[in-house]
């Protein structure tokens, strides 16, 4: 038994063979080396899956049940010890509060009125004042109710989403990402917004002082984590990345765990890079929520500044900017739950030319109900380098309570540093900084190839359209919180329907669908296959049975895999009885805009069809790209998390389509059912063709 009273330590295992028949249990104690290895692994992964347990069995020469029961006992012991420590702290705080309460009661007995110097109110007078306040509150409440009823009676009726859907045209055709009407036709005004913007509340002086102190503490903690590498950082025994040593961190931070459930865990990671952007410009992008989303379009789905507190606050050191931000992060697939944070973001220059941007969660006095994630002090250190370069060191340190369970195929990926970790932020920053540098070129670089893009302005217009296409595609992937058709989800396809009200998108009802699967090929192999124009007509419904040629290529990064391309679809004269017809428009005018990239963690291929007239506006450079309607579909390619690079291991592939529903009048329910059936068949057939062409039909 554990001498600390925490139950079995997990280091003694009992067998139940003949000894159990004789009324005794045989005890086998683990060796010190086995215990040391198990303790170290428990710090990194307290909930190992079957594969990890089998790996430990082979390494420590133990039975699977011994490993399983050891981790169960260890978790129970840790929970008991944490509860005991919490109880001791709470008991001490309770005694302190009782002492303070008694002291304040004694002080109240001798308090004097500051106005007249007389004794305090008696009990009867205080009761009389309270009664007057209650009457005043009741009067104000009645006045508010009467005004509210008057407003409701005279407010005009507004159409609901159901009412607007009742007037939707029938499914005479389904347009796969193309607006069949006027290119500049405004989107429908009906339908709910994508998310409810958190309304800011006025901050009192005490709130501002508290937020500034929290930010100052976060900056000081990040200084130590950035500058004392050997003291706080160790290599993970799972994926060889650097993680925070829990014992060393708790000795100096005194951090309080915000989640006590068995599904909660702490993620930590760090990464470093050098980018070709001036430090001041980089800081400005980090502090502007719109530029923050543009800089990390594949991670930051939504962001909003709640309060900007400025620099005139009683904060230790030189605080340049202090603000409260809300952000929603989402990656890879609808099978991966989004993460929401309400953070205090502080930018502070700690030395000449060196800044720290610190984020730390804080929920007090804000309308924020998502309590599944808590960000411990995280952020980046930015150092200005010569020749307009910047060195960026990044730390992510987050507590996560998996209330919404992640799909099993993404668990290995999220358990390492490849999910929401620092490496993903760094590789995205590298890619987007390269793209910004190339987009600022005034002339046509020799790396580009184009038959239709002839000016630098046209080149920038097409690149901006590609950026907006990627942003729209990633926003569409956030459908994990709501599944409109659970019967399709059981078949592996997630379907969602929305009334499109976004500017720059075709107006009407849009059906979004996605499906994710694991493929036993490397991400580079899958990316190369999907990029191959010779085989594209075998899986892409837009070019099925045709010939696809590339007529323009704009390189957006140091690798030629990162590019924006314009594809032309040439129809053939061969007849195919199995050919699926998605729309009746002539394919002589079919073009596709495609934006793709590949980095150290995976890649993305996003594309959307356009007719000749729309593409002419895009490449002319004379029209704002945000006015061009576009509805993208595409693929997200990621490693499966079992290796550290995209050059080995397996692939997790997400396929996502968007379909615009249009036509003549019909009942909305019939439109929805037909649309869902069509898009489900479309995505399922595409996946089957891809699996067949990759020779992995069973994956």
Curated annotation (Swiss-Prot):
The record's listing under PANTHER family reads: HOMEOBOX-LEUCINE ZIPPER PROTEIN HDG8, HOMEOBOX-LEUCINE ZIPPER PROTEIN MERISTEM L1
Tree of life domain: Eukaryota
Q: What is this protein called?
A: Homeobox-leucine zipper protein HDG8
Q: Which residues cross the membrane?
A: none
User: What GO molecular functions are on record for this protein?
Assistant: DNA binding; DNA-binding transcription factor activity; lipid binding
Q: Which residues form a coiled coil?
A: 89-149
List, for all copies, the residue spans of the domain called START: 204-438
> In what ranges is there compositional bias, type Polar residues?
10-19
Function according to Swiss-Prot or TrEMBL: Probable transcription factor.
Record InterPro entries = GLABRA2/ANL2/PDF2/ATML1-like, HD, Homeodomain-like_sf, START-like_dom_sf, START_lipid-bd_dom
- Give the source lineage, highest ranks first: Eukaryota, Viridiplantae, Streptophyta, Embryophyta, Tracheophyta
């Amino acid at each position: 038994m554990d001498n600390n009273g925490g139950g079995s330590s997990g280091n003694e295992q009992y067998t139940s063979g003949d000894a159990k028949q004789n009324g005794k249990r045989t005890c086998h104690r683990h060796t010190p080396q086995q215990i040391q290895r198990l303790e170290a692994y428990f710090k990194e992964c307290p909930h190992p899956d079957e594969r990890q347990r089998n790996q430990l069995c082979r390494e420590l020469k133990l039975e699977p049940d011994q490993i399983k029961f050891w981790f169960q006992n260890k978790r129970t012991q840790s929970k008991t010890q944490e509860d005991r420590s919490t109880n001791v702290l709470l008991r001490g705080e309770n005694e302190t509060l009782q002492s303070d309460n008694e002291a304040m009661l004694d002080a109240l007995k001798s308090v004097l009125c500051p106005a007249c110097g007389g004794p305090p109110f008696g009990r009867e007078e205080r009761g009389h004042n309270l009664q007057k306040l209650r009457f005043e509150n009741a009067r104000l409440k009645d006045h508010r109710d009467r005004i509210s009823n008057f407003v409701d009676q005279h407010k005009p009726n507004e159409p609901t989403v159901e009412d607007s859907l009742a007037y939707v045209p029938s499914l005479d055709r389904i347009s796969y990402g193309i607006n069949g009407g006027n290119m500049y036709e405004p989107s429908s005004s009906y339908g709910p917004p994508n998310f409810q913007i958190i309304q800011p509340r006025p901050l009192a002086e005490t709130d501002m002082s508290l937020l500034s102190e929290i930010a100052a503490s976060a900056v000081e903690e990040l200084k130590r984590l950035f500058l004392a590498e050997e003291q706080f950082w160790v290599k993970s025994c799972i994926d060889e990345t650097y993680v925070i040593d829990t014992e060393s961190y708790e000795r100096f931070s005194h951090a309080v765990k915000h989640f006590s459930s068995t599904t909660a865990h702490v993620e930590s990671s760090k990464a470093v890079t050098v980018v070709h952007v001036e430090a001041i410009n980089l800081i400005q992008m980090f502090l502007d929520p719109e530029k923050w989303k543009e800089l990390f379009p594949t991670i930051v789905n939504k962001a909003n500044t709640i309060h900007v507190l400025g620099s005139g606050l009683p904060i230790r050191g030189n605080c340049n900017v202090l603000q409260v931000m809300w952000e929603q992060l989402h990656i890879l697939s609808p099978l991966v739950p989004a993460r929401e944070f309400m953070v205090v973001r502080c930018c502070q220059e700690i030395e000449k030319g060196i800044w720290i941007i610190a984020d730390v969660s804080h929920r007090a006095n804000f309308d924020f109900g998502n309590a599944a994630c808590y960000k411990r002090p995280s952020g980046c250190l930015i150092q200005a380098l010569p020749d307009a370069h910047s060195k960026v060191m990044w730390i992510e340190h987050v507590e996560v309570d998996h209330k919404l369970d992640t799909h099993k195929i993404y668990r290995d990926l999220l358990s390492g540093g490849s999910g929401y970790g620092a490496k993903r932020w760094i590789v995205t920053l590298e890619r987007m900084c390269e793209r910004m540098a190339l987009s600022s070129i005034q002339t046509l670089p020799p790396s580009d190839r184009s038959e239709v893009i002839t000016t630098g302005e046209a080149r920038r217009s097409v690149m901006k359209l590609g950026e907006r296409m990627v942003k729209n595609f990633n926003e569409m992937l956030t459908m994990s919180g709501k599944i409109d058709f659970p019967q399709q989800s059981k078949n592996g396809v997630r379907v969602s329907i929305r009334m499109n009200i976004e500017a720059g998108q075709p107006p009407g009802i849009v059906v979004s669908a996605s499906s994710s699967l694991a493929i036993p090929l490397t991400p580079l192999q899958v990316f190369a296959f999907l990029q191959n124009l010779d085989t594209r007509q075998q899986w892409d419904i837009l070019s099925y049975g045709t010939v696809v040629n590339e007529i323009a290529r704009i390189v957006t990064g140091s690798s030629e895999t990162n590019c924006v391309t314009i594809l032309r679809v040439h129809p053939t004269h061969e007849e195919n009885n199995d050919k699926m017809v998605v729309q009746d428009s002539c394919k002589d005018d079919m073009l596709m805009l495609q934006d793709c990239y590949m980095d150290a963690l995976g890649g993305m291929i996003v594309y959307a069809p356009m007719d000749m007239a729309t593409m002419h506006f895009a490449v002319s450079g004379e029209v704002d790209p945000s006015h061009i309607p576009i509805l993208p579909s595409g693929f997200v390619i990621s490693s499966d998390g079992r290796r550290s690079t995209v050059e080995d291991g397996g692939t997790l592939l997400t396929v996502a389509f968007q379909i615009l529903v249009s036509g003549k009048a019909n009942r909305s329910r019939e439109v929805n059912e037909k649309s869902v059936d069509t898009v489900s068949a479309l995505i399922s057939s595409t996946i089957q063709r891809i699996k067949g062409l990759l020779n992995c039909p069973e994956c």
